[in-house]
Design a protein with these regions (language model features):
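N-terminal Rossmann-like or analogous alpha/beta NTP/dinucleotide-binding catalytic cores
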Residues: 2-120, 195-209, 241
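Short, histidine-centered active-site or binding-site loop motifs used for metal coordination
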Residues: 9-13, 44-46, 177, 181, ...
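Short, mixed-charge, low-aromatic patches
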Residues: 13-20, 47, 151-161, 201, ...
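Intrinsically disordered, low-complexity acidic/polar segments
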Residues: 16, 130-132, 294
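Short, charged/polar micro-motifs that form catalytic or ligand-binding hotspots
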Residues: 19, 190, 232
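Long, contiguous hydrophobic alpha-helical segments, chiefly transmembrane helices and signal peptides
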Residues: 40-42, 173, 187-188, 199, ...
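Active-site cores that bind ATP or allylic diphosphates and position pyrophosphate for catalysis
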Residues: 94, 107-229
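Catalytic adenosine-cofactor/nucleotide-binding cores of aminoacyl-tRNA synthetases and other
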Residues: 195, 201, 205-300
Length: 300
């Protein structure tokens, strides 16, 4: 029996729209949490001024794919929780949590694990290797009940954790702090993101945190750039069909029309969450769209 499951969805608003593969990974986080009667919450990296204008558009897209009622308010929510969008979704805003980040930055400084260069602050991997060795075990789960291990040799390189003289913290540092603060148990993402696990594992161990489980799911591919929601709706595909298609790629029934998340959750098995890849199938999406169109009520 698994412990209480807590997952999180992390948005980096570098673009006003994300492609379908990103939203599929978000949905897998929700399916895993809800299957085990757990929680999932939203975290927003809003510290780059150039990306601020994209947040509202991303929230609009997100709430079309993930029902707002499925997102929970984080526990231990001492600071940085705001309500966003027309549905007032609780979300952690990174820009409001600097005091906590600075606390842990100071801890790393006390352990002489930081290097200051120009206006940036780097984690000193060379010093870490002196203390802990140059091999790091990346524990991950290919399925919620099946663990794996990848051992990597660490390069003697530095990686940045803060810029602007410590006034802006980078995602792979801030997310580690927040995941610990909010008791996140599982990080769910596509297998192509496994390299992100290296700095996150290093930081977790250097700070004495309990490592979350890393669960990897399939990568959605396409012979062309993956479509965004706005691209598909412009062709007449409904949000309901897009959502149903994504549900189906997770349950293994991509041509089955799903009218609700609860219906899809009944077909969901954690065993279906495996690393690998699959291709976006526009014809299957069109088939789902046709089904919804044929089953519309006259008043719809």
């Amino acid at each position: 029996m698994l412990e209480r499951i807590v997952t999180r969805i992390g948005i980096s608003p570098f673009s006003a729209q994300q492609h379908l593969g990103v939203y599929r990974s978000f949905l897998v986080s929700v399916f895993i949490a809800k299957h085990f009667n757990g929680e999932t919450f939203l975290r927003i990296d809003d510290t780059n001024p150039r990306h601020q204008a994209n947040i509202d558009a991303l929230i609009d897209d997100l709430t079309q794919i993930i029902e707002p009622s499925l997102l929970d308010s984080p526990r231990n929510s001492e600071t940085g929780i705001y309500y966003v969008g027309s549905d007032s979704i609780p979300a952690i805003f990174e820009s409001q949590r600097f005091e906590l980040y600075r606390k842990y930055l100071n801890i790393l400084q006390e352990h002489e694990l930081l290097i200051h260069e120009a206006d940036a602050i780097y984690f000193d991997t060379k010093k870490y290797i002196e203390l802990y060795g140059d091999l790091i075990d990346l524990q991950y789960q290919s399925k919620p009940y099946r663990s794996g291990l990848i051992t990597k040799s660490l390069p003697q390189l530095y990686f940045p954790i803060a810029v602007d003289n410590g006034r802006r913290f980078l995602w792979h540092f801030a997310s580690v702090i927040d995941d610990n603060a909010f008791d996140v148990t599982h990080i769910v993402r596509a297998k192509d993101k496994i390299d992100n696990q290296v700095p996150q594992t290093i930081l977790n161990r250097a700070l004495g945190f309990t490592l979350p489980q890393y669960l990897y799911t399939k990568i959605m591919l396409s012979g062309h750039p993956l479509p965004k929601i706005i691209d598909l709706t412009a062709t007449g595909i409904s949000i309901q069909a897009i959502r149903s298609y994504l549900y189906g790629t997770i349950t293994g029934n991509s041509e089955k029309p799903y009218f609700s998340f609860e219906e899809a959750l009944m077909d969901f098995s954690p065993k279906s969450v495996t690393p690998g890849q699959f291709y976006f199938d526009f014809k299957k999406l069109q088939s789902v769209q046709k089904h919804f169109f044929n089953h519309q009520k006259p008043s719809d």
